[in-house]
Amino acid sequence: MDSRARSSSREAHGRSSRSSSRDDKKAKAGRGSRGRARPDAGAERQSTGRTATRGEPRAPAATATVVDVDEVRGPGEEGTEVVALLESERPEEGIKPSGLGACEWLLVLASLIFIIMTFPFSIWFCIKVVQEYERVIIFRLGHLLPGRAKGPGLFFFLPCLDTYHKVDLRLQTLEIPFHEVVTKDMFIMEIDAVCYYRMENASLLLSSLAHVSKAIQFLVQTTMKRLLAHRSLTEILLERKSIAQDVKVALDAVTCIWGIKVERTEIKDVRLPAGLQHSLAVEAEAQRQAKVRVIAAEGEKAASESLRMAAEILSGTPAAVQLRYLHTLQSLSTEKPATVVLPLPFDMLSLLSSPGNRAQGSINYPSSSKPVEPLNPKKKDSPML
């Protein structure tokens, strides 16, 4: 009996140890498969469905929405991530070349032997000259040779196996043709530009791009459309320098992956539609007319103020009025010498210009009831005579 009890206790202990080891393995497998949670979850559901007993009723399947938090990004996080990747990536000297095969090494060896055998003449075909502003990339049997680009100076290559490509490192100009752009205030215009760039990494350039000018042209057009969509027409016309700088920074962030350095971009011309030009011209003309009217009104106001001040001064000094009257007569005789001017006596002018006469509207003549005395009465003889 004791032996049977001991054996049963040993079996129970073994079963518990095996179950605990299985649980540990499942926990480890669960930790390792966290990255593959979604596909494994579907597989676990299928396995649990298969292992369920036939007699037990199945519970209704619960639907749930699984959201991967890592894939949810904000509107600005993607651009920030791209900029961070570009800043962290260092410019390489060239693409890592792949090694040559056995047959290729045999061909290289045979070519070297042939060059050595025909040394005096073959050397002229194996050496080339590279200018100071050029770099040469050599491909041997289609593989990029390790190391930096060759040049300036002499470089050696195998005529039968090697092909070389020269890359100009000088500043190059690319004219961007007119293309339509929609502004922030929904105006449609045509803009052309010019882009200045240079080749920085010849190996990376030849391995990345087939048509450099087309790639840069399309990139400039799409970048300008994207940036100018956030600016109004007035900003585009007045802030060309800042817009060109923004376009240059955006282009340089992309072309550095191709081994190209964008030095400068400029907006050459802005072409507006005919209807928009007419409306802008009408608006500008109306503004000019309004300014002219304001200036004329201000001039008339200043002239009236001057005349009022002059009238006040002349009314206070009668001698000044007389001098002004004489000056006017002199100017009339000077301008029109054939005209005869008969001046009125100054006393009559002062009488006409007096405030009382202006109020009455006429000169006070003597009344008709009294006899009018003659101006030159005849002297009567004295009674003594």
Curated annotation (Swiss-Prot):
Disulfide bonds: none annotated. It is found in: Membrane. GO terms for cellular component: cell periphery; cytoplasmic side of plasma membrane; membrane raft; plasma membrane; protein-containing complex; slit diaphragm. GO terms for biological process: actin cytoskeleton organization; gene expression; metanephric podocyte development. Plays a role in the regulation of glomerular permeability, acting probably as a linker between the plasma membrane and the cytoskeleton. Interacts with nephrin/NPHS1, KIRRL1 and CD2AP. Interacts with DDN. This is Podocin. The lineage of its organism: Eukaryota, Metazoa, Chordata, Craniata, Vertebrata.
